[in-house]
Amino acid sequence: MVDAPDILIDSRRTAIGDVPEIVYGSFALDDGNFTLDDQTRTALINADDRIVEYIRPFLGGEELLHGTRRWCLWLRAANPSNLRKIPLILERINAVRDWRSSRDRATTRKLAATPTLFAEIRQPFSDYIAIPTVSSERRNFIPMALLSAEVIASNQLYVVAGATLFHFGILSSTMHNAWVRAVCGRLESRYRYSAAIVYNNYPWPFTPAAEQAKASDAQVHKAQAAIEAAARAVLDARAAHPGSSLADLYDPLTMPADLLKAHQRLDAAVDKAYQLAGGPKTYAGDAERVAFLFSLYQRQTGLLAAAPAPRRRRGAASS
């Protein structure tokens, strides 16, 4: 434990900083008719190769972390005249319509009118950061990924659209992971990431507090560039181990030395950025990181004009 103020963390719909919005991935509500495993995908393509145009990789937390493969039919921009020429797709569309029509919930039955579409579509049109909603407490870092818009994220992932290497670097750092461990909920003992509590309350280094610390534009740009370079090095270190899943790479017992070193360099770059917001040069551990982040949170939220949202969770500055 360290000396730190007792702070109430609000549940927020938007982030306290000027950062991209975080949302859940898309929700099919299809009785499995849009979802394909490897065997089904191959069988469909062998039967009618026109189907390949409409098949996308489909990732939830399991697929992201463990490298298992899953696919989906993604028909958001499909030409209706083309779909009508592919009987195997029409069969699945019809099955979705019939299943939704048979449900008890009125909202689900209403969705039967659009059987080509997922029930909830939040798929970005650009690259995005994917964050598993639940991650093992054994990991020092929650494994996140930068994904192409061609990869469809399920509602078992959080999606940060329009994110850059800078955002990926901050979110992948020990600083952010210390915040997660301090304020997130738990599923059994695993960390449950949260948009409203974790992400939207996280105090980023270059929001009002950096101005309070009198950081120059040149200092900010230099710090951002250093984080981006270090984040790229983390991705490069991952790529140097093909065949290893994120679960393999981020198990503390099997984490490769080059990836660990890349994260240490990323942490150094992120910590230096937080110095511009008044942070110390070094931290003895998570407790000191969290104590500083809570003080920065107070400074940043104190500058917000909007009234705080209803209070949900009490944060404790402890390791």
Where are these regions (language model features)?
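S-adenosyl-L-methionine
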Residues: 1-319
